[in-house]
Every structure is written in C-alpha cells, then in structure tokens.
C-alpha cells in the first residue's frame, strides 16, 4: 500500500493539481488525487489496526508500531497542509515521514516474518 501511495502522489506531483490543469489532464489528476486520498485513509485505518493488534507483542515492537502510526498521521497531516497551503516544506515533511513509515513497517514485517 505504501508503494502505491507513493506512486499516486508522484503522479499528482508530476501532472499537477486539478486546479492547475484543464481537459483530460484535469480529469486524470483528479482521479489520481482521489485515489491518493482514499489510500491515505486506508493507511490510517491500517495503522490504527496494527496498533490495536500489537497488544501481545513486546514493548520494543509495540513502540515500533506506534512510531509507524505516528509517521502515517504526520504524513497525512503534512499532505493536507501541502495541498491547502502550497508550501514545499509540507511536501518535504510528507516525504520524510512517508520514508520513515516505510522503513518502520518494513522492519516490523521482517521481524514478525522471522518469528
């Protein structure tokens, strides 16, 4: 899901927001942005479910799950602020928190797959 989220976001970034386009490009970027938003809500729900299901894990792993959830929330908020305010700093924060979430959830996956 995180890789698809990244690709959708890059598609919107390359083409531009719907308000910046006309014709077919406006339709395409609107669809990409809509899918990007829906997937971000799915990531938020997934992070919440991971946190709820982390009860039987040890403290270190629960902290990793919490960190991943926080990074997803930060990325979501930064994305909203980037779209609303248009500042590249919010886009940078969104990218950094996305990369952090990708690394944290990757580490969680590898650790639990070995067990």
Regions found by a protein language model. Give the residues of each.
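Polytopic transmembrane helical bundles with strong interfacial aromatic enrichment
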Residues: 1-115
